[in-house]
């Protein structure tokens, strides 16, 4: 179990840009810009919900229970940097990012909750105990299209967002799906789940 707080939220969570959408749709005017931006926001949110994860780079504080294992797993990935780790109120520095994409921090003596285990008296995990005694401050996520830094968001995810926005835009007048949303004075009915299931199956977080 863990308890996560966002310390520095992302200013931008759009998984693609208006420019990319207009290029895909071969649109050269600005008539539908506001509508398209709304669709980008909505489809980016739907992708986050579908994948059970936040893709934008943010800074988190996470309280995690240690069970004596050598790996501590953080919720948000990829882990870009770890700013601090505390055991209760004591700083810990003898760790390393073991697998950034899996959110794994490695510590050779283990991440133990019990003080006697912390000092190496035992290497056995105490799985019955769920005290959140480690506090980790870390940065995780991707640089998104439209951010000032070079994009690190995988193109597969951006392409999925582009296709969702494109299909929603083109189905404004004739859509057989059942979910309906209203953007401004225009009603849009579009369910991207089948498309997302096909394109982003490998990106769905299962825990």
Would you name each region that the model predicts?
Residues 1-207:
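Divalent metal-cofactor coordination and adjacent catalytic microenvironments
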């Amino acid at each position: 179990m863990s308890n996560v707080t966002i310390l520095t939220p992302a200013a931008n969570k759009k998984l693609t840009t208006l420019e990319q959408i207009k290029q895909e749709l071969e649109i050269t005017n600005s008539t539908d810009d506001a509508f398209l931006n709304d669709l980008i926001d909505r489809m980016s949110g739907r992708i986050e919900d579908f994948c059970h994860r936040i893709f934008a780079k943010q800074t988190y504080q996470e309280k995690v229970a240690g069970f004596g294992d050598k790996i501590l797993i953080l919720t948000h990935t990829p882990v870009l940097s770890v700013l601090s780790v505390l055991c209760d109120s004591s700083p810990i520095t003898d760790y390393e990012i073991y697998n950034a994409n899996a959110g794994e921090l490695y510590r050779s003596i283990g991440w133990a909750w019990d003080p006697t285990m912390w000092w190496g008296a035992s290497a056995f995990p105490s799985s019955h105990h769920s005290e959140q005694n480690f506090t980790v401050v870390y940065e995780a996520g991707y640089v998104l299209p439209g951010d000032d830094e070079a994009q690190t968001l995988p193109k597969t995810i951006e392409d999925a967002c582009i296709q969702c926005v494109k299909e929603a835009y083109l189905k404004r007048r004739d859509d057989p799906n059942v979910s309906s949303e209203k953007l401004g004075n225009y009603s849009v009915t579009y369910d991207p789940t089948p498309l997302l299931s096909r394109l982003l199956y490998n990106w769905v977080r299962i825990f």
